[in-house]
């Protein structure tokens, strides 16, 4: 067989992949502990922390366990914590959401007490507090009444800001929610409270394990107010509206299944863009790793890097503390 001659190859991209040191030097995307936000669940009446069966490694917290987890997150350099609360009593309007001594307001105070310098983000939504599990109050026909819900979000937001939340995450996907909350906060003197708007929140099957985490009472689904997974352009409209209304952040949720939306959000936004790696995205990696199907650490890092590469400046993830520790080990 005759020798095959090839012309000299001048362009060799593999040169920049040859060693770990070179790969680190030319990496286009870098995770930092401060990029990460740790979501946490406080449960009223709990006497000891309880692991969530569908989210291995994630816990429902008591005051003591929450404060320890907040300390651990701060020590690792995590950027913030995000709090959700589950009350003992629920009613049709979710009145425990704006109880100044309710579980979520208390959890905010516990976190601030534990680490005064660590930003605390409080979720603003009624779904954990209503006996029907929807994100707002219901009209007589069973649909969520958008305009009747907005004043309740406003009351809830002021209570949480009073409790010490530096940031609020309005997640209910009600039209006009950012404007109403911003005005209520400003009128109450909380002009510096940051709004992290859940601008592009999809009616996703990946939220499944979260429902166990907050003991959801959901009846039906949320497709009439959360976004259709088939749509992307609609998200850009939602983002633009939230920015007009005073959002300081915008968010895409879920993250991994919506990287195209995240990239588009980054392209049109002049504020930080957050993305939430949700419970189902977390659990599918955890259970696949437990079954031996993949390398857990490698896939976690790849997943979070992909979210940052797509445009997220802030990533909400249940792996926040663990990943921050890994990142610190690499640097030391």
Curated annotation (Swiss-Prot):
One of its GO terms (cellular component) is cytosol. It comes from the Bacteria. It is an enzyme of class 4 (lyase). It catalyses: 2 5-aminolevulinate = porphobilinogen + 2 H2O + H(+). Pfam families: ALAD. Keywords: Heme biosynthesis, Lyase, Magnesium, Metal-binding, Porphyrin biosynthesis. Pathway: Porphyrin-containing compound metabolism; protoporphyrin-IX biosynthesis; coproporphyrinogen-III from 5-aminolevulinate: step 1/4. One of its GO terms (biological process) is protoporphyrinogen IX biosynthetic process. The keyword Cell division does not apply. 5-aminolevulinate 1 binds at residues 211, 222. Coiled coil: none annotated. InterPro entries: ALAD, ALAD_AS, Aldolase_TIM. Mg(2+) binds at residue 238. The active site is at 201 (schiff-base intermediate with substrate), 253 (schiff-base intermediate with substrate). GO terms for molecular function: porphobilinogen synthase activity; zinc ion binding. Its EC number is 4.2.1.24. 5-aminolevulinate 2 binds at residues 279, 318. Disulfide bonds: none annotated. Belongs to the ALAD family. Homooctamer. This is Delta-aminolevulinic acid dehydratase. It comes from Propionibacterium freudenreichii subsp. freudenreichii. The gene is hemB.
């Amino acid at each position: 067989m005759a020798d095959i001659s090839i012309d000299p190859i001048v362009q060799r991209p593999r040169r920049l992949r040859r060693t770990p040191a070179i790969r680190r030097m030319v990496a286009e995307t870098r995770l930092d502990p401060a990029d990460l936000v740790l979501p946490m669940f406080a449960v009223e009446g709990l006497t000891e922390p309880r692991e969530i069966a569908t989210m291995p490694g994630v816990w429902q917290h008591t005051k003591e366990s929450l404060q320890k987890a907040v300390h651990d997150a701060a020590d690792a350099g995590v950027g913030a914590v995000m709090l959700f609360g589950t009350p003992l009593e629920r009613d049709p309007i979710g009145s425990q959401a704006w109880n100044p001594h309710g579980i979520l307001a208390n959890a905010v105070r516990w976190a601030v007490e534990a680490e005064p310098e660590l930003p605390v983000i409080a979720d603003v939504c009624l779904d954990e507090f209503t006996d029907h599990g929807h994100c707002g109050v219901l009209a007589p026909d069973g649909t969520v009444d958008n305009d009747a819900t907005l004043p309740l979000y406003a009351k809830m937001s002021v209570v949480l800001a009073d409790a010490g939340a530096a940031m609020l995450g309005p997640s209910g996907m009600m039209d006009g929610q950012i404007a109403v909350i911003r005005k209520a906060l400003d009128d109450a003197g909380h002009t510096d409270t940051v709004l992290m708007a859940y601008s592009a929140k999809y009616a996703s099957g990946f939220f499944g394990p979260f429902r166990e985490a907050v003991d959801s009472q959901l009846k039906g689904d949320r497709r009439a107010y959360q976004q259709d997974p088939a749509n992307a352009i609609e998200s850009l409209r939602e983002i633009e509206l939230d920015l007009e209304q005073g959002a300081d952040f915008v968010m895409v949720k879920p993250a991994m299944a919506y990287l195209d939306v995240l990239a588009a959000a980054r392209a049109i936004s002049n504020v930080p863009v957050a993305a939430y790696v949700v419970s189902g995205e977390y659990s599918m990696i955890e259970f696949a790793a437990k079954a031996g199907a993949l390398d857990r650490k490698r896939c976690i890092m790849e997943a979070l890097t992909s979210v940052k590469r797509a445009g997220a400046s802030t990533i909400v993830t249940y792996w926040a503390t663990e990943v921050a520790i890994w990142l610190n080990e690499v640097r030391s």
